[in-house]
Design a protein with these regions (language model features):
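Structured, helix-rich domain cores that form ligand/interaction pockets
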Residues: 1-249, 257-303
Length: 303
């Protein structure tokens, strides 16, 4: 049985201070075989690589637009530096010249925590409390899908049968609970210092909860959480968000990030303050801040 995972499944942003080439650098994807194709939404041209699009040659106020679908995110993790925080930090540091336009965060359940049949029934029976005005349940040959929020909403929750959509007969269970955020909601999400898993559930808990209706209490917001939903929420303290790739793949990503993404800043720092000052500050940081778990794992595997 596969482990449950949480992942970024759509990343889209614009920049008025970048060219298409500097966006490639930002992603760590300068050396991959991009294809030049027709742009969209007012952009005349677009660089395309494995579901990653960089649109350019629009009007001056449009800047450039980078869009990574779910498959594009996987390509970024495989062929680029894979450091989403590097992208998000850049957007946070340049709020007047960049915009986070869309961000999807998905929880993939392979272990049966998300009971889609119960979720669909409770939705139809209005056994939930929500900040959304609209909801929808769809049944099709691609499986069951439950929506909270409209397609134009700044935030939307979609729970659906990924196993049926992908026709994965080799899996017993694959249900995805996806939070789609746009514009200000997406920007607020990336500004949080919480780990990704805690951020995800903090947003989900704020917008949606399935309940056990109490006929003796007319205030449904006080109702207990439905058992099937509580089982899903209880995973917040136990699930690791890091999926362990191969060591050499990690070394490549580490080098790609340090040299391609942060190389200019490091080089400037050394020229201004010297290599000894840089090493001193890094040693001080090591004593004050715990290393990211993926870097700790890399050090352990390299001996």
């Amino acid at each position: 049985m596969a482990d449950n995972i949480i992942l970024y499944d759509w990343v889209s942003f614009t920049s008025k201070i970048d060219s298409s080439e500097t966006i490639k650098d930002l992603l760590g994807l300068s050396d991959v075989p991009w294809q030049l194709v027709k742009g969209a939404h007012g952009y005349r041209d677009r660089w395309y690589f494995e579901s990653i699009s960089i649109h350019f040659n629009g009007t001056p106020e449009m800047g450039v637009w980078c869009e990574m679908s779910g498959q594009g995110c996987r390509a970024f993790e495989t062929h680029g530096h894979g450091e989403y925080d590097a992208i998000f930090s850049y957007l946070i540091e340049n709020p007047d010249d960049t915009n986070m336009t869309r961000l999807d965060v998905a929880y993939d359940d392979f272990q049966g925590l998300l009971d889609l049949t119960a979720i669909a029934k409770d939705t139809l029976d209005h056994n939930f409390v929500s900040r959304f005005r609209s909801w929808k349940v769809e049944y099709s040959d691609s499986g069951t899908s439950v929506y909270h929020g409209s397609p134009s909403s700044e935030i939307r929750v979609r729970i659906y049968d990924k196993k049926a959509e992908r026709n994965r007969t080799d899996l017993d269970h694959w249900v995805r609970c996806e939070i789609q955020m746009r514009r200000d909601r997406a920007f607020q999400f990336i500004q949080s210092d919480l780990p990704l898993l805690r951020r995800y559930f903090a947003v989900l808990n704020n917008y949606l909860r399935y309940i056990q209706v109490d006929s003796d209490d007319s205030n449904i917001w006080r109702a207990s959480t439905a058992d099937h939903w509580a089982r899903f929420l209880q995973t917040t303290d136990s699930m690791s968000i890091f999926k362990k790739p191969g060591v050499e793949y990690n070394i490549f990503r580490l080098e790609n990030f340090v040299v391609r993404q942060a190389g200019g800043a490091i080089d400037t720092y050394i020229k201004l303050l010297g290599i000894d000052e840089l090493m001193l500050r890094l040693l001080q940081r090591r004593a004050e801040v715990r290393l990211n778990p993926k870097y700790e794992e890399l050090l352990r595997e390299r001996g």
